[in-house]
């Protein structure tokens, strides 16, 4: 795994086009082990926008519903594409997905809400001391909201929860929240000890002893909560992250950033789904050269013209197909070289239609369980 997440050269790998990949991969190229791991409680699905995170998270949830007692698919992406994927309206309350009796979905907003339990009346100077101190930590408002959200999720009685997350940048901010809370709340707890004498004097002058203690009870509660969430995040038996990408530069680059950040935070990640992959066409007896030889045997000029037009169009399509495969092979090779020793890399084919509706998502979910070689292009 490369070291410098911000360095473009960290993703530079030699491109080998020696053979169309038929060799054994280092890890199984499917998600069977993920689905069969019954100890997992939280599965996060993340990556760059537009790479198929929602389709992948929905598919994982469908497969888990076959193995687990109860499954919740939870969308934290502000776009909330889960409703569109299933052609069913979901809200911020768990709703059974049509045709299931154990698979639920809900869509929530992870942005800061004024309803957070730490809300304190700002009109009173004494009560505003703690919020003002908290605001000196950028992002603490969202972090507090996130902590309460994760605590309520932790208390939900589902066998496993699949998180359909927002694009990478937003997800990285969410992952940073437990550390931010630990730092901010730890600072306030230490501050109380250092200023104990001053606070006692203020309490005696203002008769606000109960309010001070109430504030610090909340701080201690939030601190305990954030530690619990962080422990859950860092327990590989309970939590894992599935990275989703496509074989293009920006997507592979963001995947590397995400994996490096997960590694720094000790969050388990051992599955990568690569969507929109162009696989080899299986048609050994059909090629342009044979068509051109056949054209020479045709005597009728009208048929010749029509057939020649078809050959020219086929050449154009073949050029596009080969160019696409060569480009994808460059990034598939990078993915394989970077992660082949550590990850289950699942390549999913470019499909002809959008994946919307239960039937299409179910078909896609079955493909996630089928092993496929990473299709590195080679000229014949």
From Swiss-Prot:
Keyword tags: ATP-binding, Cytoplasm, Endoplasmic reticulum, Hydrolase, Nucleotide-binding, Transport
Entry's EC annotation: 3.6.-.-
Annotated positions binding ATP: 48-55, 248, 275
UniProt main location, coarse: cytoplasm
Active-site residue list: 77
Record has Nucleotidyltransferase as a keyword: no
Protein's cellular compartments: Cytoplasm; Endoplasmic reticulum
Source organism superkingdom: Eukaryota
Cellular component aspect of the GO annotation: GET complex
Top EC class, one word: hydrolase
GO biological process, one term: tail-anchored membrane protein insertion into ER membrane
Family: Belongs to the arsA ATPase family.
Primary role: ATPase required for the post-translational delivery of tail-anchored (TA) proteins to the endoplasmic reticulum. Recognizes and selectively binds the transmembrane domain of TA proteins in the cytosol. This complex then targets to the endoplasmic reticulum by membrane-bound receptors, where the tail-anchored protein is released for insertion. This process is regulated by ATP binding and hydrolysis. ATP binding drives the homodimer towards the closed dimer state, facilitating recognition of newly synthesized TA membrane proteins. ATP hydrolysis is required for insertion.
Subunit-level organization: Homodimer.
Protein name per UniProt: ATPase ASNA1 homolog
Protein's organism: Plasmodium yoelii yoelii
Top-level taxonomy: Eukaryota, Sar, Alveolata, Apicomplexa, Aconoidasida
């Amino acid at each position: 795994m490369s070291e410098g997440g911000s360095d473009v050269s960290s993703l530079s790998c030699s491109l080998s086009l020696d053979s169309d990949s038929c060799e054994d991969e280092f890890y199984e190229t499917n998600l069977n082990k993920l689905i069969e791991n019954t100890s997992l409680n939280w599965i996060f699905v993340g990556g760059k926008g537009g790479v198929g995170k929602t389709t992948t998270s929905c598919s994982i949830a469908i497969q888990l519903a076959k193995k687990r007692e109860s499954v919740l698919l939870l969308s934290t992406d502000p776009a909330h594409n889960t409703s569109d994927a299933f052609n069913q309206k979901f809200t911020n309350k768990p709703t059974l997905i049509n045709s299931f009796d154990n698979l639920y979905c809900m869509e929530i907003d992870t942005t800061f809400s004024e309803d957070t339990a730490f809300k304190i009346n700002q009109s009173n100077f004494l009560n505003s001391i703690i919020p003002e101190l908290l605001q000196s930590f950028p992002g603490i408002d969202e972090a507090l909201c996130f902590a309460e959200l994760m605590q309520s999720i932790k208390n939900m009685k589902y066998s496993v929860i699949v998180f359909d997350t927002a694009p990478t940048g937003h997800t990285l901010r969410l992952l940073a929240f437990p550390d931010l809370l630990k730092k901010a709340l730890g600072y306030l707890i230490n501050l109380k000890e250092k200023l104990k004498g001053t606070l006692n004097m203020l309490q005696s002058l203002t008769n606000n002893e109960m309010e001070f203690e109430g504030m610090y009870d909340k701080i201690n509660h939030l601190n305990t909560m954030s530690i619990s969430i962080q422990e859950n995040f860092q327990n590989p038996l309970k939590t894992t992250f599935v990275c989703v990408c496509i074989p293009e530069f920006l997507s592979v680059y963001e995947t590397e950033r995400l994996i490096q950040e997960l590694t720094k935070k000790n969050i388990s990640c051992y599955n990568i789904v690569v969507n929109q992959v162009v696989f080899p066409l299986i048609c050994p007896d059909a090629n342009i050269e044979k068509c051109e030889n056949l054209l020479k045997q045709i005597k009728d000029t009208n048929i010749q013209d029509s057939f020649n037009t078809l050959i020219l169009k086929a050449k154009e399509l073949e050029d596009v197909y080969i160019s696409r495969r060569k480009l994808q092979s460059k990034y598939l090779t990078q993915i394989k070289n970077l992660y082949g020793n550590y990850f289950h890399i699942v390549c999913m084919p470019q499909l002809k239609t959008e994946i919307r509706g239960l039937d299409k998502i179910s078909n896609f979910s079955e493909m996630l369980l089928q092993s496929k070689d990473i299709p590195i292009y080679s000229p014949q």
